[in-house]
Amino acid sequence: MNGIEIFIDESGDFGAYEAHCPYYVVTMVFHESADSLYDKLEGLEYSLDVLGLAEHCIHSNPAIRGEDEYFGLPLSLRRKVLLNLMAFIHNADFRFKCFFVKKCEAGDETALFAALKDVIDPFVSANFKRLSAYSTIKVAYDKGQRQISRLITQTLEERFDNVQVVKILPIHSRLSQVADLCCTIKRIAQRLSDVGSLNKPELYFFGTAKNFRRNWLKSLMRSEWK
């Protein structure tokens, strides 16, 4: 079987718990190497160009909140940016998986690392045969946090003999933005489940919790690794 690429991104840090950032999230985006991304990427770039945002680097949370480079941009434009990225996910047939840890339940860096390993290990074990069938498993990570590099070693490199950790290439920048959108939508869904409501910027962007679940979360979940 052809190879598979796994792009890994993270949200959060290994510092102390803070109420505004209650979760640490590791996101894996999967793409079979045999399927070329270039024509799909061209479609995304064209869509952004039409919106007047050529070569724009998409940041999902600021787009939803209307912050940073999205401050003052019309709501309709911000929605179109994320909808175009969502369409790219479906067109490229990506699969993703998000792994959550509540930082309030992990007292320190060691406990947080162990908690992340505890949620990733069962997934890898359950999919061991499926992943082993690929000729190569190429893992792309920007090595932004040494703990995640160590996690990759312990959960993937030490368990498979066909893992190659590769450098981040320019084509991976859009995959990073895919991982960011997956993480953002799933994080909002997790908090919605925990507290029962969206915050004010999210309500303005999505309209209602029901609309968020039906038109955004449900759409994204079509691409979750199963």
Give the positions of each predicted feature.
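Phosphate-ester processing/binding pockets and catalytic centers
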Residues: 1-226
